[in-house]
Amino acid sequence: MVEKFKSFITEAKEDKYRILVVSAEPDNNELFHTAQRFVEEGKKAGQQVYVVKVEGAIISYDSSVYKIYNADDTEGFEISSSDTVAIVRGSVRLKKSYLDLLSRLEKIGVCMVNSRETIEVSADKYRTYVKLQDFGLTQPKTVLIPNEDTWKVALESLDSKFPIIMKTLEGSKGVGVLFIESERQIESLVQLLYNQNKDVDLLIQEYIKTDGDIRVIVLGGKIIASMKREVVEGDFRSNVSPGAKVKEYPLTELEVEECLLAA
């Protein structure tokens, strides 16, 4: 992916870009690895790169010039609508103030990868489902469980045989994804989850057995990377965190069409 990014930032125009790498956790080496690779490749390509630490970052406007500053920086980094690209990394969605910084950059005209709306929709599994549904994409049947007492109504609405999948609306790395094999199990888990957090948001989905899932990255209307994550042995999930193996994956024509439509 980094090689494709390097090609992207050099092919569109000869002038230099100003690149912001926006991260909520720039000091965490494990979580910041991908962002750091963007920094390295951007600099190799001769671009100006600035890491924005969203905690405490501010934007100033003076003499028709916008600058963004980290809390520990007095010099800042000039930004504009004509030459600045922001690559948003890390858990920026965790705080509204972080997202508000993205909104400010968008208002200035900075090219955002990705925008606040995209991040918020992608972080919510049901909003993602609705958004993709708007474009006619094929998806597993999905129903919300709006509160603890409506799980049975939701199950009837799903109208799917067991096993099914239950998920928290937010979560990553396979956390909050549950394999449900009976009514007794779903009732017990719903009660448990609502007991732990009365504001928890849940959905249930039709279970479709597969040997893995496909991840695709689309940039500027082009597919720049694709991979397959194989199901972890003894599990139903294919997340890398619990040990899924990853390999290159050539997309079919239908998959290309669906991915571009989704993007």
Specify the residue positions occupied by each region the protein language model found:
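Active-site nucleotide/adenylate-binding loops and adjacent lid/helix of ATP-dependent enzymes
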Residues: 18-24, 35-36, 69, 80-81, ...
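Beta-strand scaffold of nucleotide-dependent catalytic cores
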Residues: 189-190, 205, 213-231, 262
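A long amphipathic alpha-helix within ATP-dependent nucleotide-binding catalytic cores
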Residues: 201, 206, 237-263
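Conserved N-proximal alpha/beta basic substrate-recognition cap immediately N-terminal to
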Residues: 26-141
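Short glycine-/acidic-enriched loop or helix-start segments at secondary-structure transitions
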Residues: 31-32, 97-99, 175-176, 214, ...
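Charge-dense, intrinsically disordered terminal/linker segments
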Residues: 1-17
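Residues at the starts of beta-strands that form the adenosine-phosphate
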Residues: 17-18, 48
